Amino acid sequence: MAGLMGKYAAFLTRRPVLGNMISSAVLFGTGDVIAQQLIEKKGADHDLPRTARIVTWGGILFAPTVNLWFRTLERIPIRSRWPATFARVGLDQFGFAPVILSGFFTAMTFMEGKDFNAAKVKWHESFFPTLQANWMLFIPFQILNMGLVPLQYRLLAVNAVNIPWNAFLSLQNAKGRKAEEDPVAISKKE
């Protein structure tokens, strides 16, 4: 295991964006599989396009964006470790988290083949409960991550915590899809 981690660390040093893209894609996909198989118990009815969408989000959209964001946060000109950490976490959670979650719900809706109005509906239904859950998990986690973990490993640390978080995101995103596909659920809303 130590040899594998050493190779991964060397790869991250040589190709940080690509390494984080691959890690994020795998871990976002893992979260969706957990959501579908362990929580929703879909079995053979696994929604592969849903998994492909969340893998695409994690690997192609999320990872490069967060990689750049973490490097930007590192430039905050505060020399003392903990004041800099709290400044970074504040910017991350109250500035960046709302943007990236909005991007998630919008991108997932568009990848499902739906229009901007559908994205607005999904955002209104899912954004605030998801943001509150994000803050409960990621504010304490990011204090530790940004205060103690070297920059090149921060996205990997986030991705490790993201396995259960991605299962939650997948469920939040699918919740709106189920209502759209179930005429009984739609008629109950009216």
UniProtKB/Swiss-Prot annotation:
Subcellular location: Mitochondrion inner membrane
Domain of life of the source: Eukaryota
Topological category with respect to the lipid bilayer: Multi-pass membrane protein
Cellular component annotations (GO), alphabetically ordered: cytoplasm; mitochondrial inner membrane; mitochondrion
PANTHER family: PEROXISOMAL MEMBRANE PROTEIN 2, PXMP2 MPV17 (PTHR11266), PROTEIN MPV17 (PTHR11266:SF17)
Summary of the function given for this chain in its UniProt record: May be involved in cellular response to stress. Required to maintain mitochondrial DNA (mtDNA) integrity and stability.
Entry keyword Nucleotide-binding: no
Signal peptide: none
Annotated InterPro entries: Mpv17_PMP22 (IPR007248)
Transmembrane portions of the chain: 16-36, 54-74, 91-111, 131-151
Family under the similarity heading: Belongs to the peroxisomal membrane protein PXMP2/4 family.
Highest classification ranks of the organism: Eukaryota, Fungi, Dikarya, Basidiomycota, Agaricomycotina
GO biological-process terms attached to the record: ethanol metabolic process
UniProt keyword Plastid present: no
Primary location: mitochondrion
UniProt protein name: Protein SYM1
Key words of the record: Membrane, Mitochondrion, Mitochondrion inner membrane, Transmembrane, Transmembrane helix
